[in-house]
Amino acid sequence: MSEIASRVKAIIVDKLGVEESEVTNEASFTNDLGADSLDTVELIMEFEKEFGISIPDDQAEKIGTVGDAVSYIEEHAK
């Protein structure tokens, strides 16, 4: 697992209060991890802060799974 993936998963565990074992690349923030729309906005904001990136709203809407988040951040992180 990449450093970015590890950091993304740690943020999700912290923010959503889920078990690390639940946070798989295929896990949907809403369907599998119980996040609501506010939770997902907060996750995106935390990813932006942690990785020093900006995620436009139109891109944030496409980030629905843990794997989506990791892929986006790996592409855009400095």
From Swiss-Prot:
<dbReference type="InterPro" id="IPR020806">
    <property type="entry name" value="PKS_PP-bd"/>
</dbReference>
<dbReference type="InterPro" id="IPR006162">
    <property type="entry name" value="Ppantetheine_attach_site"/>
</dbReference>
<dbReference type="InterPro" id="IPR036736">
    <property type="entry name" value="ACP-like_sf"/>
</dbReference>
<keyword id="KW-0444">Lipid biosynthesis</keyword>
<dbReference type="GO" id="GO:0005829">
    <property type="term" value="C:cytosol"/>
</dbReference>
<dbReference type="GO" id="GO:0031177">
    <property type="term" value="F:phosphopantetheine binding"/>
</dbReference>
<feature type="modified residue" description="O-(pantetheine 4'-phosphoryl)serine">
    <location>
        <position position="37"/>
    </location>
</feature>
<keyword id="KW-0963">Cytoplasm</keyword>
<comment type="pathway">
    <text>Lipid metabolism; fatty acid biosynthesis.</text>
</comment>
<dbReference type="GO" id="GO:0000035">
    <property type="term" value="F:acyl binding"/>
</dbReference>
<feature type="domain" description="Carrier">
    <location>
        <begin position="2"/>
        <end position="77"/>
    </location>
</feature>
<keyword id="KW-0275">Fatty acid biosynthesis</keyword>
<dbReference type="InterPro" id="IPR009081">
    <property type="entry name" value="PP-bd_ACP"/>
</dbReference>
<keyword id="KW-0276">Fatty acid metabolism</keyword>
<protein>
    <recommendedName>
        <fullName>Acyl carrier protein</fullName>
    </recommendedName>
</protein>
<keyword id="KW-0443">Lipid metabolism</keyword>
<keyword id="KW-0597">Phosphoprotein</keyword>
<dbReference type="Pfam" id="PF00550">
    <property type="entry name" value="PP-binding"/>
</dbReference>
<dbReference type="GO" id="GO:0000036">
    <property type="term" value="F:acyl carrier activity"/>
</dbReference>
<dbReference type="GO" id="GO:0009245">
    <property type="term" value="P:lipid A biosynthetic process"/>
</dbReference>
<keyword id="KW-0596">Phosphopantetheine</keyword>
<dbReference type="GO" id="GO:0016020">
    <property type="term" value="C:membrane"/>
</dbReference>
<comment type="similarity">
    <text>Belongs to the acyl carrier protein (ACP) family.</text>
</comment>
<comment type="function">
    <text>Carrier of the growing fatty acid chain in fatty acid biosynthesis.</text>
</comment>
<dbReference type="InterPro" id="IPR003231">
    <property type="entry name" value="ACP"/>
</dbReference>
